[in-house]
Amino acid sequence: MDAEPFVVVGGDAAGLSAASKFRRTAPDREVRVFEKGRWISYAYCGMPYFIAGRIDQLGDLLSLSPAAADERGIDLRRGHEVTAVDPNEGVVHVESDEGGESNEGGESIEQPYSALLVATGGRAATGPFDVRELDGAFTLHDMDAAAAIDAYIADPESYDPGRVADTPVDRERVKYNAAQPAPETAAIIGGGYVGVEMAEALRERGLDVHLFQRSGHVLQPFGKAVADRVETELAERGVTVHTGTPVDALRGEERIEAVAFDGGEIEVDLAIVGVGIRPNTELLDGTGIELGDSGAIRTDEFGRTNLDSVYAAGDCATARHTVTGEETWMPLGLTANRSGRAIGATVGGEETPVGDIAGTAVVKAFEMECGRVGLLDEESAREAGFDPVRETVTAGSRSGYYPGNAETDVTLVADRE
C-alpha cells in the first residue's frame, strides 16, 4: 500500500470523478482533493438557464456536495490552493485561505503524493477586455459569475436572494449587483456556445440583445450551414446578430455604457464577454511539463504526462481525436468526467485508457437544438490527410404522419474515397 495519498488538484468534474473512481477501485487507499475555491462539481452548462429563470435555485446545478464527497471517503479540502508542484520530491505546496477546511487559516502545507492528478480546468478568455474595470461587464466562468449576472439583471426591488440560498456564493458580490439599476440592452461578445445560449437567456429576461461575432458566422465548430439556421432563429427571436464584427472596446466610466466596433458603437448597460477559454497550466511552470500547441498539458492514452506519477485531465489537458488520431484540445464536460474516471481507475490499480474523443457537443438556440460530432472543418480534414466532401441534407425529424414532425438539417463531411 502506498504510504502517501493520491493527490488531486481541482475539485470539479475531472478531479472528483477521478477521486470517486479511485475510492471505488482502491477503497483502502487515501485520496486528497485540494480545491482553491468554495464550489465543487457543478453543471457549468446549466448556468445560462439559471440566468434565464428556467432553473429556480442555483444550488440545483450542484452535482456533488462536500458531504457526499465525505461519504465517499474523499478527503476534500476547499479553500486550499496548490501553489507549486515539485515533481522531483513528489510534493505539492498548498496555501489555505481564512475559510479553509481541515487546516488552520493561512497555513502553508507541503503535501507528498504517490500520484498526482492536475485537474485545474480552464478560465474564461477575455481578449483585450478587462471586465473587472466596469460594473455590468462579466464573463460567465463560474457559479459566482452566474449569481452576479442574475442579480444584476433583476429589478432591485424584486430580486429574490433565495435563488442562491444554501450555496457558498459570494454574497457581497450578489448584494452589490442586485442593487444596480436593471439593464435594458446587452452586448454579448463571442458567438460560441456561451454566447448563443446567453442570447436566449437575456431575451427571456426581457433585454434587447446584440450578439457580436468576430468571424463570418456564429458557432464555428458547427459549420456555416448550421450557423445560418441558428442566426435566422436568433434574429426571429429578437436578437441582433453582428457577424464579421469584432468589438474593439468596452466604454464607460464606472458602469458599462457602450461597446465600440469598427463603424460605430452601441449603447448598452450589460456586456457578457464569451470569447473562449484558456487552460490553467501556470501551476506547472518550471516543472518541465510538456504542453501541446493549445497550451494544454500533453497526455498519453492513460492521461499520464511526461512527469513521473503526474496525470492531467479535463479542460487543462489534451486528448486524442478519434477521427484524425492527432492530439487535440476540446474542453468539454463529458471529456473531463470520462478521463477523470479512467485516471482514478488507473491510479487505483486498474489501468484504463481515457479513450479518444470525437468532439461531440450540443447547443440550444431557443427552439432550435444543434449537435455535432467528428471533424466538420474541411481545412482540418485536409491537414489530417483526408480529401473531404461536404453535403447538407434536410429531412424530417420523424415520420411525417406523427405529431411533432419538423425539418432536420444534417451536414455530412466525408472522405471522397
Language-model features and meaning:
Residues M1-D75, V196, E200-F222:
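Beta1-alpha1 glycine-rich phosphate/pyrophosphate-binding loop at the start
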Residues E4, R29, A115, D135, ...:
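Nucleotide donor/acceptor-binding cores
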Residues V9-G10, V118, I189-G190:
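Conserved N-terminal Rossmann-fold NAD(P)-binding element of oxidoreductases
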Residues D28-E30, L76-G105, E110-Q111, R205-T299:
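A Rossmann-like FAD-binding core segment of flavoenzymes
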Residues E133-N177, E254-A258, D262-A345:
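FAD-site-proximal beta/loop scaffold in flavoenzymes
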Residues D144, A148-V226, R237-V239:
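Rossmann-like NAD(P)H-binding beta-loop-alpha module
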